[in-house]
């Protein structure tokens, strides 16, 4: 029996060539406003599939278009340069750019790690994904939209952010060299917390970890039941200020961060067990928060 040497991809929606050839594109504007009419975000002349709703357009453009560091091109795809001969950088202006950086990066890593049986299968994988993304048959999570392909397609790097990855060539856990060559593409995290103020795994350390995840578009949740309740004794002789005081710090920090650097606020989940001494305070606070939200 022949040994399986990789994935074989059968085309269902595309044929060799341009995967977008049957898709109609149009230029649109995207504008996000507050209830009082003030403008949160606005971008004009963006290229979107004609079948997309305005809501889908606004989500794509305001949240998932990269807003800086992207080489600008003319209508023929040639890079634009300034008077010094440097490539002009700016935002993504077409959803094709987003679909391309996602599908081409996934194909690249698949080929790097030997996933495909042949180059033709890798190309079919890429083309099928581009078509399915453009026709809304498929969509990845937000961190993929935000981060995937920024290094592979545009050469973006940035300082290391404390992320680690398993090097496929060695099997070793390795610190990331920069922000985007091996980005953080996972959506949701559950993190633990120790009843400790400043040491690793403690309260303040959690806020740093949460900020790192929020910055790249992820959400996080934690059960805070390990923390002592208000008035419980501390080893230094004082008493704890309680869970609620620390939750307010975390809530303010999360509210100040734009998830993925866009208009989307960070997603955060707080859990407190029913038998925790501060559960009634937490319940009352949560009820008050809900009642203060607009209808």
Task: List each model region and its residues.
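Extended catalytic cores of very large enzyme megasubunits
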Residues: 1-284, 288
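Positively charged, low-complexity/disordered segments
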Residues: 289-295
């Amino acid at each position: 029996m022949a040994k399986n040497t990789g994935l074989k991809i059968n085309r269902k929606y595309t044929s060799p060539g341009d995967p977008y050839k049957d898709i109609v594109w149009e230029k649109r504007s995207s504008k996000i406003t507050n209830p009082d009419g003030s403008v949160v975000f606005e971008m004009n002349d963006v290229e979107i599939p004609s079948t997309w709703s305005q809501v889908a357009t606004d989500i794509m453009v305001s949240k998932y278009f990269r807003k800086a560091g992207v080489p600008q091109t003319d209508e023929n795809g040639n890079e634009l340069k300034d008077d010094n001969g440097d490539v002009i950088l700016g935002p993504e202006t077409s959803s094709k750019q987003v679909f391309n950086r996602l599908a081409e990066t996934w194909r690249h890593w698949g080929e790097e790690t030997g996933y495909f049986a042949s180059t033709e299968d890798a190309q079919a994988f890429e083309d099928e994904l581009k078509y399915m993304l453009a026709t809304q048959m498929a969509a990845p999570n937000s961190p993929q939209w935000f981060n995937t392909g920024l290094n592979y397609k545009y050469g973006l790097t940035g300082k290391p952010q404390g992320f680690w990855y398993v090097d496929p060539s060695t099997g070793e856990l390795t610190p990331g060299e920069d922000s985007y060559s091996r980005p953080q593409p996972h959506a949701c995290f559950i993190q633990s917390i120790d009843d400790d103020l400043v040491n690793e795994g403690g309260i303040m350390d959690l806020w740093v970890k949460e900020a790192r995840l929020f910055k790249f578009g992820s959400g996080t949740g934690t059960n805070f039941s390990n923390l002592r309740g208000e008035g419980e004794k501390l080893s230094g002789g004082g008493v704890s200020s309680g869970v609620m005081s620390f939750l307010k710090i975390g809530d303010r920090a999360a509210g100040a961060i734009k998830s993925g650097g866009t208009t989307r606020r960070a997603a955060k989940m707080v859990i407190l067990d029913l038998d925790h001494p501060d559960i009634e305070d937490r319940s009352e606070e949560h009820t008050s928060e809900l009642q203060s939200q607009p209808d």
